[in-house]
Amino acid sequence: MQRYLPWFRVADPQASAQMTVRHLLNQTSGLPYFPSAAALADFDDSPGAIVRQVRALSTLKIKSPVGTKFAYSNLNFNILGLIVETTSGEPYADFVQKHIFDPLEMRHSYSTTADAKRDGLAVGHRHWFSLPFPEPDIPIPAGSLPSGQLISCAEDMAHYLIANLNGGRYGDLQILSEAGIAELQRGAAEWREMGMLVGYYGMGWVSQEIGKVRVVSHGGNVPNFSAFMGLVPEQKRGVILLLNADPYGLPAITEEIGMGVTALLAGQPPAPIKLDFIQWIMRLLPLIPLLQVVGVFATLRVLRRWEREPAICPGGGRLWGQHILLPLFPNLTLAGILVYMRSTGVIYFVDLFMPDLAWIARISGSFAGIWAILRTALILRLARKSG
């Protein structure tokens, strides 16, 4: 890869030299996920946004040795986008317009929200406590444009799927060679979750079998929209599903509906929709700060009793175990979660995709840290006074 970007570096010099374009395409570079999520919150759209973000990876530690395992990260696509810019001499958006949108007659596809809005872009939504709210003005982070920020419609994406199902041909134009399309859809790296094989990932597509029929697919989302593409290559059938809402406040409906339709196109029964409690968990999130407030009043009530009746104030092991260390655990856990989210950049991802969870984490984590210190000090002060 350093052939195209000689200056490219991650924290490990050997890994920097080993990474190839194919590693990026197959998501086997070892680059981690959450730094790419944090990059989505960088809305600097001045020239050179992609190169700035890629240069910022010079201190990044990779997740696994290069080429050894599949680990999805949008950083791979952002680096690939920069390679496209470097080798073509064109901005990524211009390259996509000239070499994909124009030849595929994708006349309602855009790289900026402003252009898409002028053509009637649907209003996107984010979920707060599993309820959808309009979010029409989330900008596109220019530095992450190559990793999934392009805007399209069902008709245009149908043109894209036609080329993928027709050996790279659309109308009279050969957009990509038939061998190139076969390589894209081959699947190169095992995708495992919880140790179980999900499918094979390669060059943007997940290859799986439904029954004995091979299908390829890819889903994705931005904070206020989500999408799914599915193909049955041998039958030359495909589906595109576009949803003007993010999926994080709901079960994974975009993917499950998309895979269900793909299964039907393959002549197979769709998998049942999984029972998902995420939306109910999200609705219960406001109970966390409420329970914290209840805990404060309960503690103050106990402390007032101890102050009025010093004789009932416990001491020794009971004081430390039951009244100090045990209550410290949930408070320090909540505070620790917030510290972890901020130190790893996870908070930026949560801000964009799960704003309700982000605010609960900030409020409850900050409150828990402050209250843990204050509560311990109050108890120790009263214990010394009592005895």
Located regions from the model:
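Short coil/turn segments at secondary-structure boundaries
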Residues: S36-L40, K69-F70, T113-A114, M196-Y200
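Active-site helix/loop module of the DD-peptidase/beta-lactamase fold
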Residues: M1-S36, T59, L82, T86-G124, ...
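Stable alpha-helical elements in mature extracytoplasmic
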Residues: M1-Y4, A17-V21, S46, I50-Q53, ...
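Residue-level signature of the cytosolic catalytic core of signaling kinases
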Residues: P13, A17, D45-A49, T68, ...
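Short, charged, amphipathic alpha-helices and their helix-cap/turn boundaries
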Residues: Q2-R3, A41-P65, E90-R107, H127-P136
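Second-shell loop/turn segments in exported
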Residues: R9-Q14, A38-D44, P65-K69, I83-T86, ...
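Active-site SXXK
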Residues: F77-E85, K236
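Catalytic loop of the DD-peptidase/beta-lactamase superfamily, centered on the K-T-G motif
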Residues: E90, Q97-K98, I138-G387
